[in-house]
Amino acid sequence: DLSIDTITELLHCLDDALLIENGGFEQVKEKMLKEYLGSAYRTPYQAGGVYPSDPSELRGLLSEYCKAIRQEECRVNVNGDLVGILSPHIDYARGQSTYARLWKTARDNLREVELVIVLGTDHYGGPGQITSTFQDYASPLGISPTEISVVQTLANEMGSEFLFKEEFHHIKEHSIELALVWLHYSLEISRLPNIPIVPILCGSFSTF
């Protein structure tokens, strides 16, 4: 049998690790959210882990990924304009060929793009929840400015309480970030300026 002292010690350990949703957890969460909202942009959380934080090293890595893809693998028959890209959000080490083939193919079509609406998987999002943010998204290769007017329109239509209820998730969620690194690289290669974005995290679709 577990003693009261053992249970108490276990609870203290869980509390210290912020694994209990109590006052301490909420205080830390509010502090992190305040720091996030007070920053000039959303800091690239995966830099230095999934991909290099040094711009030159990152460019070299993505360039090597692209060189491994033959040009004939990037030919697709598209009737009309580019309207969307299904980009993976797995780590680059395992998804490199898919990322490279996709973004190398899309590169020539980015010149006409005026706005990128990024729908990223929210691995911790609630059922039916979508979450945007006013923060710009940064990577070592640039900053994607968030189109404030579009996000504000969404907030007006859906309610700010709903749209920003889980904004905290933007801090560490990787799905949008991993796609935007490739967008920044592709724009740089094509000598194009960064394109405004509307970053939206999507929670579980299980309720639909």
Please tell me what each predicted stretch does.
Residues 40-208:
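Active-site histidine-anchored catalytic micro-motif
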